[in-house]
Amino acid sequence: MEAKNTKKPSRKLVVFKRELPFYLMLIPGVTFLIIFSYLPMFGLVMAFQDFTPLRSFKNSPWVGLKNFHDMLALPTFWNVVGNTLSISIAKIILRLLVPLILALLLNEVVHHKFMRMAQTVFFLPYFLSWAVMGGVLRNLFQYDGMVNELLGRIGIDPIMFLGSNTWFPIIIILSDVWKDMGYNMIIFLAAITGVDPALNESAALDGANRWQQIWHITLPTIRPIVVMLLVLSLGSVLSAGMEQIMLLYNPMVYKSSDIIDTLVYRLGLVNHQWSLSTAVGMMKSVVSFILVVISYRIASKHFDYQVF
């Protein structure tokens, strides 16, 4: 009688069978990433061509760096870069500062029900899309909107908030902070609650007041979290929020609120300058990548913070 084959399946095969459902669930996300993130990279060749859809990639003539030269020669280019940097930097600073202050204040709240309610109120706008937020902001700040109606009741003339080069960037920045501050606030609050209570108790016994405990214990302890969020933010310093601005802006505020992404949109989809539009977008991507590398090096060297 032949001996039965009792060889056990390999450990790798067992693990693969166990994890197969998870791999299958990854397929839609990976497919979406490949189609909408990696395949479009082949279009970067347009930045070095005089591209038109009728001639396609194959027959469009190569022009070298001409499109990048034309990009720098655009009369509005440097104004657009300045708008992008000013709006984006203001957003980055306030996205860190406002949530941090709110987290410190909520950490001092004694009533847990009030704290949970406040967390919900601050975090709720984060789940709203900019399509919804754009409608809310228009109803609030348009010429016959709620804000101007309230101003009129106290004797102040209506203000064209959405048509003013002074007010429009302020609305863009503050509304972005309002929408996203809940996310960072939760992160900061979780980090603060992780601070060892014994440190604060020892400091209190030594005569430190609450402000001194926050300044010398809480803030240094959560510094790695702040650095992490800052590093993640610096990579998007050239992304000032296209969806938000596109839903609200108009030609009256191009001077103060036209950013790189909206310039790419107008050049490509409105003016049909495909190659020039691609050159501007490629410039933004390359500079953003360099900024990510630099910010990581700074965080690693000066704050002893490493991601990989």
Model-derived features: where do they sit?
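Short, Lys/Arg-rich, polar N-terminal cytosolic tail immediately upstream
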Residues: 1-16
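A structural signal for multi-pass alpha-helical bundles of membrane permease subunits
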Residues: 18-308
